[in-house]
């Protein structure tokens, strides 16, 4: 019996391309509508997102629109939680599609596993050609290092999960989302869950699809910001980064540093060429064995997507060191 009330929290901003399909997927959820509330927190969209949401909210009383005048995701999530009345919180993203049993499976596995945060693997799907290439990069070990939450068949405990679901009281007790974190807010929350003895569980029974950025320039901006705010996360918690998080930064420093030194030294020029050649061979190999793409031209574009992810994240990581390392970043106790 699904008698517990569930609040679905959805941050939105200029999502007119995706919002209608997303809202329809919410209407198709098999969780009883009398025990469901859907809170769409809008960052003052300038496209037709708000109009579309309002038209649905007028028809369906369990949907409501909340304004987020501060625009960014972490504020939206906390506003949603503060305006919620459910025993459970399920976070969703409008840039995605969800299976009909998504909410009910989240609640089922929260009960079954006694984990503090439960979700499914991040399955990335594209609509346009470029989106499909970028989606393939998410499943490429060379691009993201094979993170467990990007593996479609992974089930078990992990250090993070996209979106997630929680008991509301627990989420409030650990301080909800850190409003100083416009990026990496999920990682920060999951770190605090683990720090407080909680567990994070992923199961492929919880099914969804995420739509990635539509252009390489948007992908660059996204991963640059991830790199910047990863430093804030490291600084806040005093947690040493994984070796894999250093690799993009080392690659960028190598490209720029050895590239400049190659003008003054033949030895550095040869090392620079050798390094780029090795990177290109590895990128070529992992791109061309990727089964998500078929055509040679798409696999070549995948090489470019991998490169964009590496350079943008590495450059952001370096920028984050300059931005945060000498600043008085406050450490939270929650």
Model-derived regions, located:
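N-proximal low-complexity "stem/linker" segments adjacent to membrane-targeting elements
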Residues: 1-28
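Cell-envelope/extracellular polymer assembly enzymes that use nucleotide-activated donors
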Residues: 4-7, 37, 188
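A conserved acidic beta->alpha catalytic loop
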Residues: 42-51, 70, 93-99
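Glycine-rich, basic loop-to-helix element that forms the pyrophosphate-binding segment
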Residues: 68-84, 105, 157-162
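Short aromatic/hydrophobic "clamp" motif used to bind/position activated sugar donors
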Residues: 89
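Conserved donor NDP-sugar-binding/catalytic core segment of glycosyltransferases
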Residues: 100-132, 136, 207, 211
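Catalytic donor/gating beta->alpha subdomain of glycosyltransferases that bind UDP-sugars
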Residues: 110, 178-241
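Membrane-embedded multi-pass helical conduit in multi-pass membrane proteins
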Residues: 250-327
